[in-house]
Amino acid sequence: MCDPIREDGSNKRGAVSKEKRPYIHREWSWADIIRALTVINVHFLCLLAPFNYKWEALRFGFVLYALTSLSITFSYHRNLAHRSFKLPKWLEYPLAYFAVFALQGDPLDWVSIHRFHHQFTDSDRDPHSPIEGFWFSHVWWICDTRYIKYKCGGRNNVMDLKQQWFYWFLRMTIGFHVLMFWTVLYLYGGLPYLTCGGGVGGVIGYHVTWLVNSACHIWGSRSWKTKDTSRNVWWLSLFTMGESWHNNHHAFESSARQGLEWWQIDITWYLIRLFEVLGLATDVKLPSEIQKQKLALTR
């Protein structure tokens, strides 16, 4: 006898019933439309960049990509999602705020989805599961919020953040902050800063992040025995600020360091280590040698 399906789409064994999901011809929520328009607009601005080229604007775009990407990896990912180190609130909050300008959502939404990803990695309930195809795990999942709720349920895995007023404030006002930022870009540098700066920088930041969800579960090498398809992709490590050592990350989720070997570039870890030396980052978590020996593929 088949297990009954619950309202969240799961049966009593916790598995989601598998069905072919249409990407375009489906019911779209307002959240889906807003996300899709944001992604489309950023790519459109990037396509306009050659017609509004200014070197200083393009240089700003590269800097914007680097800083917002680092804010995502440092704040949203390793600090908030995995609690791999602690920061004083006067530092934690501004870093989380700056990550908003990466256009990847507010902290509550980003952290919840990422925690679900680790809870249900490579299964039907993974929010951006690679088993549904490269393009789904790369980008399509972003614009299907009802499917995420259907698979994972509500945002009940971020109670630690929900208890803090600042993250509720960002969630309720994120649209204002993003529009304010892009308005300032235009007022400061006109179309060149919107296209070469925001457009080019935004597109690079988008796809570098998305490749961790897609490519790093398909191609690359494995150093650790994990129950998923995570891979280490060395050539992405510089661009992702160290996030592409993805097999390392899935083996030791709470580790503040993902480039576990000396030669594995991990810019996010270098910043965490600097903050630790300065006394700003505390309780920095790293895997023990015993943990490494248990999961190592080669000894």
Swiss-Prot record:
Disulfide bonding pattern of the chain: none
GO molecular function term, any single one: acyl-CoA desaturase activity
Cofactor: Fe cation
Tagged with keyword RNA-binding: no
Record motif Histidine box-1, residues: 77-82
Record pathway: Lipid metabolism; polyunsaturated fatty acid biosynthesis
Principal cellular location given in the protein's record: endoplasmic reticulum
Enzyme superclass (EC): oxidoreductase
Motif (Histidine box-2): 114-118
Membrane topology (UniProt): Multi-pass membrane protein
Domain of life from the UniProt record: Eukaryota
GO CC terms of this entry: endoplasmic reticulum; endoplasmic reticulum membrane
Chain ranges passing through the membrane: 31-51, 55-75, 174-194, 199-219
Motif annotated as Histidine box-3, chain positions: 246-250
Keyword set includes NADP: no
Pfam families xrefs: FA_desaturase
Similarity comment text for this entry: Belongs to the fatty acid desaturase type 1 family.
Name of protein: Delta-9 desaturase-like 5 protein
Species: Arabidopsis thaliana (Mouse-ear cress)
